[in-house]
Structures are given as structure tokens and as C-alpha cells.
Amino acid sequence: MAMSERVAVVGGGVIGCAVARELAPEYDVAVYEKGQIAGEATALAAGEVTMLSSYEDYPDIGWHAVEFFREYDGTGNFTFTELPSIGFVSPDQEAEKREYAEQFSADGLPISYLDSETASERYPTFDFSDHAGVIEHGVSGFLDPYTFAITLQNDARADGATFHTDTPVHDLLVEDDEVVGLETDDGRVDADHVVCAAGWRTREFLLDHTPVPVRPYRTQCIVLEPEEPLSDGFPMGWYPGEHVYFRPEHNGDFLIGGWSFAENEPEHASNDADEAFRQHVADLVPTFLEGFERAGYVDDWAGVDGATPDTRPILDAPSDAPDGLVVATGFNGRGIMTAPVAATAVRSLLTDDEAPFPMEPFAIDRFDTRSDDFEFISISASE
């Protein structure tokens, strides 16, 4: 590989920033973003890191992310706060979830099944009376998404990467079935490789070259102030049957998110949480947490991300695509936590070096069709 090979990255969200940081020491990297860095889905993310529960079937993927966040903690203003996470188990799921915990704990993952009595002793703020117990994941955590992305950008810049904001990219330039650059608002940009990390917009951008099965969906977050600040031992978690996940804030507030649905008009989607979601949260939270009967409202927001048919991203150089193109999209709300994995995967695809984890879960040929007409699966409803 020539040290001067040029890589153009389409998209300045957390994935684009992570890719730029990974490649900048060896490549001439330029990132093109139509707005501001980390200005859309990244800034609106909840910042949860639950990679081991998301990839229990491929633990090397989960551990790669966890180890990165542990090592990156303290870089610039970035911090990674580790907390356990719990998933509520309904009575009809008890046998299945006990078996799940036994299987993966035997494989060395920090996963346990706690019956409702044990869970109540460990997490006394919760009311588990309607549940058989919880699945406890011992390794998870959270971070501030915007700070993370900007720290990645700063590292990339220090290694020579350039970032071009307010610069829409209009077309992928291809000659003789090879990528040669991009057409942007500022004119033509020559490149030896292009990494498309444009979120839900990736499908339309690449449709003439390689269709990708990605569709937009909208997700929401609300922050509440409980009657007393949450304690240091308060966990992250999710309530699958109610389509929500939650975590504490550093100041003792409570963030709850989810209520995700496919979005047919992403450019016009509201940035505010729906009234239906606000009411759902108001009704639901006091049923499983103490101290929220008179909780105060702090903030809410909503954002649009890209989904794939199986909820896992596409990190691949598709065989039917022009040579030199790498696709990194469809993170289903897990872009923040998957960013270190995505960056390593993209580097592997460019250099042909073997990745330190399986790449099969991210290959585009795992799908039978490239259509975007598929049923959206909400990860907040299924975890």
C-alpha cells in the first residue's frame, strides 16, 4: 500500500470520525459532511454500550469494543462509565432466559439470571413483582456521544485527516468499475477509496452502484428528574415488552429511550419526542421504579437512524460494487457502541489484513435480498 493513498469518507457522524481516526496514520483521509460533525443521529444517541449482550454469539466483537472504550477512557474529555445492565424477564420467559444465561455464562460471558427476590435485593429501587427476574449483564456502560465523536475527530486531525463540513456529497465517481472520487458541493474530489458512512442516506447515495438493504427509522429519548437522584449503583437496562431501555445520568437523572418505528419521511421527521411516548413513559416508569410518581421533566428528543433486516450493520466491500468502495451503515441505534468495531473492520477491508473478530455478521451477502422493503425490528423491543 502506498502511504499516499487517498480515502474519502462520506458522513461525519461517529462512524465517519472513528474510521478517520483509524485510517489517518496510514492514509490521506478526508471526511465530507453535509452539515456539522456529529450533528444528526450521533448527537441524538443515548450513548449506551451493551456490545456483549448485542453480540453474545460473537463475543470477540463485543470484547473488541469494550476493550477499546476502557483504553480510550480519559482521552481528552472523553469518559466511559461502566455499569451492569439488566433485562426484565416475564414469567413466560423464565425457563428460556435461565437457559440463555447458563449457556453464555458457561462460555465465559458475564451473564447471570437473577430471580425477582435476588434482583430486588441487589437493585432495591426497582419493583420486580410483575417479573420472574432479570438477566444481568456484568459488562456494559455509557458515554456522551457528542464528546466521543469529537474526541475521535481530534485524534484523526492530529494524524492529518481533514474534515469538510457543510459539504454535501452528490455522487460517487466511478471509472472502469473503480472508485475515483466524489462529486461534492465544492467540486470533484479525487480518491483511491471511498468509505460510505452516511447512515440511512447510504441506500439512495449508492443505489446506482450497489443497493444496500437499509431503511430509516425514528427513535426517541426522554430525561426525567426523580424525586431523589439515582444512586451510584443504579443499573442500565431494558424492558422489552414495553419497547424501552434506560440508564442513569451522571447527575442522578434518568434517561429512557426507545419507542422506535420505521420512518417513511425521514427528512421531515420531528426532532421532539411524541406525546404518545411521553404519556407511555409517564404511565410506565412508576410501575417498576420507586421515586418517580412526581418525577420532573427535563428534556426529550428524537432522531432518525438506519436499520437493516437483522438489526446488525453492513461493514463490507460488496462484490458487485466498484473496486475501492467500502460500506459502513445500518447500525440500528448501536452506532456509538459499534464505532470501534466499524473502524477496525473498515481498515481490514482496505488493507486485506485479518480482523481480530469475525466479519461474517457484517457481510452484505448474508441477506437474501437488497430491498429496503423489509419489516423493521426494534432492538428496544427485542433485547
Task: Identify the meaning behind each predicted range.
Residues 79-87, 107, 113-116, 120-151, ...:
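Helix-loop-beta segment of a Rossmann-like dinucleotide-binding subdomain
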